[in-house]
Amino acid sequence: MTQLPAVEKQEEHLRLRIFLQPKASKDQIVGLHDNELKITITAPPIDGQANAHLLKFLSKTFKVPKSSIVLEKGELNRHKQILIPNPKVIPTEVNVLLK
């Protein structure tokens, strides 16, 4: 069985497979973790706060409207799949994972 890549470019969109660590000391893209992109955020995993904070962080990082980012899988899990349409910026930590 073939594993899916952590970061995948599809036309003008990016699909990220994320391992999320909430309640961290800062918001950051850490790098590759078991074939997923590890991201840490400061928000706790309570009442959707971590998901909302993640979307806000990704919105700022990729310079796209928060409302355009789609949480495709993992609403109640730390393993998430997110679609980012037409990112204006691709951070170095993500760009090195593109094939």
Swiss-Prot record:
It holds the Pfam family DUF167. Coiled coil: none annotated. InterPro entries: DUF167, YggU-like_sf. It comes from the Bacteria. One of its GO terms (cellular component) is cytoplasm. NCBIfam families: DUF167 family protein, PRK05090.1. Belongs to the UPF0235 family. This is UPF0235 protein PM1313. It comes from Pasteurella multocida (strain Pm70).
